Amino acid sequence: MDTAEGALALLILLDQYPRNSFRGTAHQFATDPLALMFANQAVARDLHLAVEPELKNFLLLPFEHSERIEDQDRYMALVAGDEELEKWGKLHRDTIVRFGRFPHRNAALGRQTTPEEQAFLDEGGFGG
């Protein structure tokens, strides 16, 4: 992770590849802690500012995918001014504020779904 491009490649591998290859299973989220660790390192080194604007979000998605409100807040701060990213970030953050987790992950992670979460999911609740 010596370069912005190296960080980008690593974070796509850790964050996006599992989400697309192991959809619906716990494996989809297995590398999230590593992705978040490396995203923190990349941002600390301002690597997210060194990639093309269209690619920047791939360096930041581990914050948006985290179930910790602090990471959600950090994502929102990092994408401030980008209306499209702010829109999606708000959907993620609002879900964490409301439930403390992403209910659409419950089945894959073997978590019990609360009645409020089930109602949210039944109404088409955010599943990003």
Language model feature labels by segment:
Residues M1-A9, Y17-G128:
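Surface/interface-facing alpha-helical segments and adjacent flexible terminal/loop regions used
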